[in-house]
Amino acid sequence: MKKMMLVMAMALMGAMQVSAQNVKVDDKELIGTWVMESMQWEGEKKTVCGKESGYSQFKFYGADGEYACAELALTKEGKVVVIPHEYGTYTFKDGWYSEMGREAIKDAIVWVDKTTTKGTWMKRHDIWKKVNLPDKVVKYIVDCCKTKNTPADIQQMIKQSMFK
């Protein structure tokens, strides 16, 4: 009898652990502003983003598929530097994620809960938190990312005049 109870308890614990690992969150919860909480390259120490490290990343996911990504650095003088990474579009459906028209990847974003995701980029493991930032801040960072994309006509003129 004790063996049977032990087996049942272990089976129940295993089932509970599996269900805790498979959090189901609606795809639309990705919409909004996300800030990197931590990152860890394989074989290296975990970096906690924020004031102490002076580094973080920002991602914006719009309801219409708009996507913006930037790095944020805090200088020794206390100034924030926004380093635009990219601006374009994203898709996210049933665990399949793509940004900037790249091939979709299954489980590139894994839900921990409604406001936390984890994922791996190359060999870096990231944790992201959904945050409410002032609209003015979000607009500024997204606009910085937009200006990183040089218009096609300007690109062509630069190529013709500087890269002959």
Locations of regions flagged by a protein language model:
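Sec-dependent N-terminal signal peptides
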Residues: 4-14
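Extracellular/luminal ectodomains and secreted, surface-exposed scaffolds of diverse proteins
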Residues: 88-90
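Lipid interaction determinants
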Residues: 21-85, 96-164
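Positively charged n-region of N-terminal signal peptides that target proteins for export
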Residues: 1-4, 20-21
